[in-house]
From Swiss-Prot:
Organism for this UniProt entry: Caenorhabditis elegans
Name of the featured protein: Cuticlin-4
PROSITE patterns: ZP_2
Cytoplasmic side: 493-507
Gene Ontology terms: cellular component: plasma membrane
Matches recorded under Pfam families: CUT_C, CUT_N
Amino acid sequence: MFHFTRILAAFLLPTLCFCGYSTAPSSTVSIDNSLIGEPEVVCETASISLLFKTRNSFNGKVFVKGYVSEPSCMTVGDGKTGHRFEVRHDSCGVRRQREINGVVISATVIISFHSIFITKIDRAYRVSCFYVEGTKKVHNHVDISALTTQLLESETQLPVCRYEILNEAGGSPIKYARIGDQVYHKWTCVAELENVYCMKVHSCTVYDGQGGPPVTVIDANGCSVDGVILQNLEYTSDLTAGKLAPVFKFADKAGLYFNCQIQLTIKDVNYGCSNTQPQCPTSQYVVEPAQKTTETAEPYPYDSHESGYPTRPANYPVASSRYPIPTTQAPASYPSSPAPPPPGADIDNGYPEPQPIYIAETPENAYDGIVGFNDTEQPFTTSAAYTEDGVYSRLIKRNVVESTEQINASNKKRPVTVGDIDLPERGILVFGLEEMEDGETTNAGDHGATRALREARNSQEKTCFSTSRMYFTLILLCLLFATTVVVFIVIVQKQRQILAQTAFFKP
């Protein structure tokens, strides 16, 4: 029994020593410095400053996130404890976000205590300043003949406007989407008074949110710039507009941030909101009419006449008593048209005399071969300029009567603008083509981006669950091993006590 106890002790002693060595805490070296209190943000006219103090001298670096390589966006500590880091509004990718009463300018500043690497004691701060647009009211009064004119003012609340990106018309707002998904852009204004205001959406831009240049999708007139991205808007009411459009994205950028403006005008009593709402062309190409109309004279075909003009050759006989043929003849002249001879002149030059052409006022027109006629044209006379070796061209002057739409357009008044609102921007996160699975289909009630986000979360939850399960199993094995060691130690102690009490060891 004593021999067995010695063997067991010799076997467990290295194991206990190894466990004691492996569980000893490792020594690390950390930077002996930290921030004192919270940094202070100073909003200036053309820049944002961050003031902070450190416990010891600071020799690290302070920079704007994403712009550490630019000298104007990064500074190195000078060994002091008090520091000031300044970022200008027009540099380092500083973001501008329009609000109803002003603009928010923000940037992410990182304070690193190491000159090269980012360590766990470093801090990152989202620095933002809100600049309020100041308003000032000016009052004045006029005294006339000792009578004081009192200024009476009446104020009414302007409509409250908003811009939303929905998964469908009448749907719910979204924050995630995929390339090719259909989203609904909606602009609405809510007014206290009905049938008073009209709205026009204009000057819409989109940018990536990372300092890239904005791209115009709706111009200043409220018309679409690129029909592939966003077509002309549909105004369903006086204060509501929207359009269904496919989702797109910038190259290598996941964010899309839209910014639009809304012009509010007074509704016209006669024409409603037609003066305010944009009249955009349905096509990207505009066909303009020619400034002049020309006519070409050629030998007249007796079989058919398809020129469209109520004219005939000068020598064409008229088989009707309603249109008499003059007996005089015109002198020969080419290429210009001669004036008709005076009445009674007897001139014989071999050329047929020009005949006056009239437009019938009744359907019983003797010109049966003419295809259509224009009742707005005045009677005119053709000349004997039709020759075999020449072409005669002349201008045709028509008295065109303006249409009702043209008259109404000229009588319309310019709408009275009461405000031009810069709406807060709206952004969505777009999943790229490389993140789309092959053969994936989108259900009617399940948005593609929402499903993608849910799948990503499920995968993350599964990974976290597997990691937690592994940790739990490892802890359980350690506890089991420790329990086994304790049991062996207790058994060894009991055996020693039993052996010490036997008579074999007594003197």
